[in-house]
Amino acid sequence: MGTLTFRLATVVDAEQIRAIYNHEVMHTAATFDLVPRSLRDQVEWLEARSGAFSAIVAVDVADPAGAVAGEVVGFGALSPYKERAAYRTSVEDSVYVRRDRNGQGIGTLIVRELLSVAATSGFHAVFARINASGEGSIALHRKCGFELVGIELEVGRKFSRWHDVALMQHLIN
């Protein structure tokens, strides 16, 4: 792994973010989206995000393996946890790492960056809703201080089967 840097995502990153996300849509149950995003959808998603809810990208600025310098290797974002006003101090994270870069600590760095954004923005609780069979994502969140607080049974249907969701939570002191 080269040197990683984090920055706010811009529309220039839309195609690389879309490629990472659409791989998960088409090949895994990490997201319950069923239809890949178009480039326009991805640009609109990025343009709709601001402040604490801005997307961040992990960019490899010095990849010794010969990849293009400045490649987006992962992204993350915070989203409002629920619509009702009393939930305003809680957020939900989303973290995606390019498949060929899994296991290199990038996801951990993205989650830690999101926790820092959440703390700076005055949030109290960060939630992660993870496919319960997603052992890697569950382990990643545990490593970052999240605790399992519940399992929602058979709440998603993808690839002709039911999927449970693990609800994990990190309280910010």
Regions found by a protein language model. Name each.
Residues 19-36:
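Helix-loop element at the rim of GNAT/NAT acetyltransferase active sites that forms part
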Residues 118-130:
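Conserved GNAT acetyl-CoA-binding A-motif
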Residues 5-17:
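A short beta-loop-alpha structural element at the N-terminal edge
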Residues 8, 34-100, 111-112, 117, ...:
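Acetyl-CoA-dependent GNAT
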Residues 77-80, 85, 127-131, 138, ...:
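Conserved catalytic-core motifs of GNAT/GCN5-like acyltransferases
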Residues 103-120, 139-143:
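Conserved acetyl-CoA-binding loop-helix of GNAT-fold acetyltransferases
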Residues 16, 92, 125, 136:
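Amphipathic alpha-helical recognition patches that constitute DNA-binding helices
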